[in-house]
């Protein structure tokens, strides 16, 4: 009886916590369909008019395209740098290894305003004009951490004997990578890339210091939030950002819980192809 009461109590607390986290977001999502341009509750009716208005707003489209481009390039850069760093630190032992690992993950722990100010000072010192590429560099500083952590965690859970067994069975470097290493790391890379994209897409603090005169979607929201006539469009833009953030995070979570044990069987399959 006590255990049942404990389970009920924990369930109630879990529901309360989820409601606390998501109720404000749900209310804002409802406002995106508000038929009135005045934000009041309850809303008088539902409409998709503001979605059409947002899509036909050239500033919104330009901000959306810039956010997608910056997030995509920052994610690609993070995948390369994060993966190389994870491989180097997971498979090697050298003096200062732990210090390098600490410095790699530090940017995501620093307040965004500190990172933004540091990057802005760096660009100013080297007389680098703020542009699309300064946004990418700013976002890559924390996107690399996400990819690095995902790949490093997967490598640490993977025995190096799999690669050694593949080599012993006659596989060359490319075959070992294709049939052993890649199946093991693919979900970690995709998950890390999706998380990096989500973080980059909705980043606002670092972007404020690195974008110059350019406007991403989060900056568009920040600039127009206090303008009453733009509030319905701002709600739509915020709703779109929520969707474009939730979807990659959900897919990433599903991928990280996937079972990668079939990679062991793939290592054995290399033998048949090399004989």
Segments (PLM) and residue ranges:
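Hydrophobic alpha-helical transmembrane segments of multipass integral membrane proteins
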Residues: 61, 65, 69-81, 85, ...
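Transmembrane-helix boundary motif in ABC transporter permease subunits
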Residues: 1-7, 72-104, 117, 121, ...
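N-terminal, non-cleaved signal-anchor transmembrane helix
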Residues: 1-58, 62-65, 69, 249, ...
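Membrane-interfacial helix termini and adjacent extracytoplasmic/periplasmic loops
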Residues: 39, 43, 48, 97, ...
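C-terminal transmembrane helix and the adjacent membrane-cytosol boundary/short C-terminal tail
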Residues: 3-12, 152-163, 167, 173-182, ...
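Transmembrane alpha-helices
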Residues: 12-13, 18-25, 116, 148-151, ...
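Interhelical loop and adjacent transmembrane-helix boundary motif
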Residues: 2-6, 36, 51-59, 201, ...
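A structural signal for multi-pass alpha-helical bundles of membrane permease subunits
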Residues: 23-36, 66, 116-127, 150, ...
């Amino acid at each position: 009886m006590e255990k049942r009461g404990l389970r009920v109590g924990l369930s109630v607390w879990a529901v309360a916590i989820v409601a606390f986290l998501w109720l404000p977001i749900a209310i804002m999502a409802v406002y995106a369909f508000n038929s009135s341009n005045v934000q009041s509750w309850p809303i008088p009716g539902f409409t998709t008019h503001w979605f059409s208005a947002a899509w036909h707003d050239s500033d919104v489209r330009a901000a959306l395209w810039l956010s997608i481009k910056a997030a995509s390039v920052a994610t690609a850069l993070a995948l390369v740098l994060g993966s190389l760093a994870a491989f180097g630190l997971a498979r090697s032992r050298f003096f200062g290894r732990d210090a390098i690992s600490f410095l790699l993950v530090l940017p995501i722990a620093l307040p965004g305003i500190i990172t933004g100010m540091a990057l802005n000072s760096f660009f100013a010192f080297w007389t680098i004009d703020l542009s699309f590429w300064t946004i990418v560099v700013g976002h890559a500083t924390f996107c690399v951490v996400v990819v690095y952590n995902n790949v490093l965690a997967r490598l640490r859970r993977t025995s190096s004997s799999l690669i050694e067994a593949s080599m012993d069975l006659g596989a060359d470097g490319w075959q070992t990578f294709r049939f052993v290493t890649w199946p093991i790391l693919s979900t970690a890379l995709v998950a890390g890339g999706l998380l990096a994209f989500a973080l980059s897409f909705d980043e606002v603090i670092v972007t404020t210091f690195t974008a110059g005169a350019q406007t991403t979607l989060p900056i568009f929201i920040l600039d127009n939030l206090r303008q009453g006539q733009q509030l319905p469009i701002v709600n739509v833009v915020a709703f779109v950002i929520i969707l474009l953030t939730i979807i990659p995070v959900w897919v990433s979570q599903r991928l990280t819980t996937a079972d990668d044990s079939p990679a062991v069987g793939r290592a054995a399959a290399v033998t048949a192809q090399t004989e």
